[in-house]
Amino acid sequence: NCDKPFLVIESAKKEYRSLALADKAQSLKVYTLGRPEYNCPEINPFFVQQGISLQTHIDFLKDLFNASFSFYGPMPYILEKCLQNIYRKRGWNLTLGYHPYFLGLNKKRLGADTLDAADIRSRYACKASKYLFPTMEDLKGEVKRYIEQEMTYEGEVAGNIKSAMLARLESLCSGSKGYMFNTRGRLDMSTLLNERAVF
């Protein structure tokens, strides 16, 4: 019996899950990916952790999508433009890497007091802040809009690119993957790392 926090990530085997049966205090949290009925986490991949620059986060998202799906031709470029657009539409400043809400809406200029970590942390903690971040559905809609209205490709080429990208994103917007990734929910990493948990 261990009172120390731990996190076990077991992707294939399920042996650690049996600890939950033996845990009388029920302090062990078991997360089950892809099974909403069994404590499936909601993870908005577009949520930017406090202290991470927006551009770095967008670069990580590009790498994640490129590793998960086989993008070809102009798809990586389209993805990058659409990622930037969905944050811009939510009010983010791509140059500074912040949303004005986190800096204080009434501040006219950036100064030393603008980047007060405690103030930003309290704004992140506000439940309404989750609406400042895009969702997978936002990305899917932006890809569709961008290809139809801004892309210079026409005819069959544009149709093939649109179909390929939307099919890939649709798979992340529906079913159990949609429950996990097409959400405004966010997994609180500080809580997760301070509890006894099995993924």
Can you describe what each PLM-predicted range is?
Residues 1-199:
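P-loop NTPase motor domains
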